[in-house]
Amino acid sequence: MAIGEICTREVVIAKRDVTVKVAAQLMREYHVGCIVLVDEQGGKRKPCSILTDRDIAVAVTALGLDPDVIRAGDVAAKEVIEMNEDAGVAETVAVMRMKGVRRLPVVDKEGTLVGIIAADDIVTLLAEEMSGLATMISREHKKEAAERRTSASGRD
């Protein structure tokens, strides 16, 4: 399954020069733990970083810095790690694990932001798939047991 099929398409975004306070207000308003910082290039939004609530807590609040002055781009991750929407779930999990991140911007072939994928989204998907598989296995076991009973009673 392509990650583009399960990513969240409504992404909270901001430019890297917004203040940390504005970024935090966006997170609160939209009930999210991160925002994707973007650059506009030819009318397209290209992810340049991701700012998390943890970044704010550790790099601003804990140090007593002024969130009205500090810019989101100054405390956000310097390396943008993104996934192409055609990437598979296993590949995405591998990148998250290797890079130690829980959220990744999702981009199209041109590098334009199209969504965000969180580890929670993948865990939910896998849990639903495993539940469906367990239900199918249980149903098959019951069917086979019923067939054995029917066949055994036919021999009597």
Segments (PLM) and residue ranges:
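The conserved cystathionine-beta-synthase
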Residues: 13-32, 38-39, 83-100, 107, ...
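A glycine-centered beta-loop-beta connector
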Residues: 27-30, 35-55, 96, 104-120
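Tandem CBS (Bateman) regulatory domains
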Residues: 1-9, 48-84, 88-97, 118-156
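Context-gated lysine
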Residues: 15, 21, 44-46, 78, ...
